[in-house]
Every structure is written in C-alpha cells, then in structure tokens.
C-alpha cells in the first residue's frame, strides 16, 4: 500500500533568523502523523487486486486478465477515468463542523460519472488541500472517502494532503477526487445506442447531492435559516445542516449489478448522472441528435427539501430545475420490453425507481411536461 503523501507549502515569513517550516506555521510532523494514522481506512477498501507496495510513490492494482470471472465480463477491456470535487458543499461542512459526509460525496461524484459508461469502479485517489493539518477533521474526511469507496466497490489506493496556509484561510479546505474503472468496449453505454421507444427510468436522489450549494448557502443566509434548527416542513427532527449535508447517493453497486444481470442482450442503452444543469441538462448529453426524451414531471414527487429551499429563496421553478436534481439523481435509458424487469432488479437492491419518460424521434432535446 502506498503511503498517503502530505505536501507542505510554507508561508513566506520575513525574519533575520533561519527560516523553518515550523516557524512558517507548517508542521511536517503533524502531516506525517496523519498519514500514518489512516492506514486502516485505506486497507479496508482493498481487495485481492491491490498489490502491497510499502514505501512506494504510487499504488498498484492488478487487472486479473487470467481469472475466469474477468474473462467472462471483459473481452476487450478499456480503462475509464474521471475526476470531480464537492464544490462549496465543503463550506457548509465547515459551518456545521461536520466532515465525515463530504468524503462520501467526493467518491460519489466521480464514480457516479464513471458508471454512466457502464464501467466497474476499480480505484480512487483523493486530494485534500488545507490551511493547516488538523488531525480529527482530516481523519473524518478520509473516513468518509473510505466509506464511499467501500460502497462503490473500489480501492482507495492513495491520496495527497497539501498544507497551504498562504492559499487557504484558517479552517478552510478543498477536495478533489479521481476514479478509474474498467468497461467492456462493445458494451459501453452511450447516446449511440438509444432508440425511439426506449424508456427513461429515474433513480431517486438522497437529497441535494453535491451541486447547487452556492445557491443553497445564499438561501440560508438570505432567509436567515438556522443550520442547527429542525424545520417541520422537512418532515423530520434532523437539523437543517444535517439534512443539507446528507451524502450523495452512490449508484455504482446497484447499477453495475443490474447491467451485468443481462449477460447477452444490452438492455440499458444510456445513462446520465444528474448533477449541475439538472435533469434536462444532463440527460440530453446521453441521447442522440435525432431523438428527444419526453419527461413526465408528475411521475415522481419532488422531495420537501427542494420546495423548502424554493420557498425560502423565492427561486423560480425553471431555476430550481436547472440547478438541482429535484429528487432524481440518476437516469437509465432502457429497451421498453425490459423496463419493468430493470426497475424490479434495481428495487431489489435498494433503489427507489420511477418510470419518468420515453424516447421519441426529435432533435436531441429533453422536454419536461
């Protein structure tokens, strides 16, 4: 297992004495202690594909070409990679002093993009930039990353912690994640496979996920909402901050399992991760130019949280749908004769699924009615 690296960028202080990292407010010892403390969090995500490499500068993962299971799933395997962050949701985590969920978000944002192509997540790397190494905060973040990797079925192979007190204010941090997966080239899901008559299934989101938090935080400030207060409109006794920090749902395990249950026919033709841009802005990336996706807005109930935000921010409906997922976090386009079977398989593994529309001849548009 490669060690987690901690990079220290000092604050340049003017002094007549010899300068040191410690004198510049940067602790090498604290960074090394943190890196040493999280080995268990990394190892619990590792399977037999991970090759132990003590003291290495990079991680290694074996593609088990000679294993029968791998040969059954992959004849022409291709690597798939993507990267993403959590955006200003980290500011909300800072305000609430709750850091364990944004690590899950970090994994979700990348692996949910990865599986759009039908790729099996293999490994994940994280990058954490901080003002100062704070052991408990960083431990909570990486704990969330570890939990996210376990949910996605991929290995947390390593990471970087950059201490930069010149760039970040005290208490501030930022996150970036990088995911790599493998897909069978002939079974990659994309717009080219979509046909008129295909059915659009929507998988329920767990909340706001990780997009639109600049607007969310503006609403909280504008309406003078209290993050530590429970609001009856949200149908629960959890404080608002906790509701807003609900981690992004990771769809990897259920989606990949469902796709693989159809060993011969490719019944899932395209997919979309619903992030910034809303359902229309993301689904249109997964349909061809000669087709439209006709979406029935009445096919699912918009969760109370979105109406709560809309009310307190006086946000127009069109803006809400352009910014937020509105209760649908992932879409799958499937052949019509298999739509009911795919829905039942997804529900069996814990997803809430709505039949939200169909594909028709058109001009590459998503039409919401």
Where do the protein language model's features map onto the residues?
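N-terminal amphipathic/basic leader segments beginning at the initiator methionine
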Residues: 2-4, 8, 12-51
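Short, acidic (Asp/Glu-rich) active-site segment that either coordinates a divalent metal cofactor
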Residues: 83, 174, 187-241, 280
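Hydrophobic face of alpha-helices
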Residues: 35, 139-142, 213
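Glycine-/charge-enriched secondary-structure boundary and capping motifs
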Residues: 2-5, 16-23, 40, 137-155, ...
């Amino acid at each position: 297992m490669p060690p987690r690296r901690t990079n220290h960028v000092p604050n340049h202080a003017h002094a007549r004495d010899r300068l040191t990292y410690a004198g510049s407010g940067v602790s090498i010892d604290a960074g090394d202690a943190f890196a040493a403390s999280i080995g268990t969090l990394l190892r619990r995500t590792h399977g037999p594909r991970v090759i132990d490499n003590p003291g290495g500068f990079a991680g290694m993962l074996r593609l088990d070409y000679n294993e029968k299971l791998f040969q059954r799933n992959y004849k022409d395997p291709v690597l798939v990679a993507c990267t993403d962050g959590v955006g200003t949701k980290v500011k909300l985590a800072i305000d609430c002093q709750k850091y364990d969920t944004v690590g899950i978000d970090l994994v979700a944002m990348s692996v949910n993009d990865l599986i759009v192509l039908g790729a099996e997540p293999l490994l994940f790397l994280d990058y954490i930039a901080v003002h100062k190494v704070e052991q408990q905060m960083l431990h909570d973040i990486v704990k969330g990353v570890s939990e996210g990797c376990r949910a996605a079925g991929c290995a947390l192979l390593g990471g970087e912690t950059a201490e930069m007190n010149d760039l970040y204010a005290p208490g501030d941090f930022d996150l970036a994640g990088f995911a790599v997966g493998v897909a069978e080239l002939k079974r990659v899901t994309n717009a080219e496979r979509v046909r008129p008559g295909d059915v659009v299934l929507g998988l329920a989101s767990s909340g706001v996920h990780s997009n639109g938090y600049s607007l969310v935080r503006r609403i909280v400030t504008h309406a003078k909402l209290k993050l530590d207060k429970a609001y009856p409109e949200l149908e629960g006794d959890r404080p608002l901050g906790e509701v807003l920090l609900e981690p992004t749902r990771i769809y990897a395990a259920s989606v990949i399992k469902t796709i693989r249950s159809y060993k011969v026919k490719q019944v899932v033709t395209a997919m979309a991760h619903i992030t910034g841009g809303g359902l229309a802005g993301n689904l249109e990336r997964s349909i061809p130019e000669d087709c439209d996706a006709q979406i029935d807005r009445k096919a699912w109930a918009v969760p109370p949280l979105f109406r709560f935000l809309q009310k307190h921010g006086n946000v127009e409906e069109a803006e809400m749908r352009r910014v937020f997922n509105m209760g649908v976090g992932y879409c799958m386009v499937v052949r019509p004769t298999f739509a009911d079977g795919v829905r039942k398989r997804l529900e069996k593994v814990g997803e809430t699924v709505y039949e939200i529309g169909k594909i028709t001849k058109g001009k590459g548009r998503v039409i919401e009615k």
